[in-house]
Amino acid sequence: MNSIEGIWQPAYAEFNGEEAPKMMLDKMELELANGKYFVRFGGVVGDEGHYKITPTGITLLGSKGPNAGREIPSLFKFVDDMLSICYGLDGILPSRYSTAAGQQRYLANYYRKLPAS
């Protein structure tokens, strides 16, 4: 099932070349449904907005939370049953699925927790 919609649990993530703690990832989930996104931490929505699929990837348009008013261009791909997203937190579309110090990139590999309802 290669639909981006559903509830996704991060299995691995890194920001600016540093791996995110597993304990943080275990409490986080990303929901993509009907053009809207929600990021939950411990079941509480901490960030939300809209998304649109583009010819080059996916763009998040934040409406509430730390990304309110921001446009975040991102790459995405499916690798087997995993969804990989590389977010351009600086507003620039990443050119590859990697991060390094000072780049303002967030890379996450997700597994599907639940399909879209």
Can you annotate each of these PLM segments?
Residues A100-Q103:
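Short, solvent-exposed loop/turn segments at conserved positions within beta-propeller repeat blades
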Residues N109-S117:
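Short beta-strand-to-coil "C-cap" segments at the C-terminal boundary of structured domains/repeats
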Residues M1-Q9:
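N-terminal helix-cap/turn-to-beta initiation motif at the start of protein domains
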Residues A11-L25, A33-S98:
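Contiguous, well-ordered beta-strand patches that form the walls/edges
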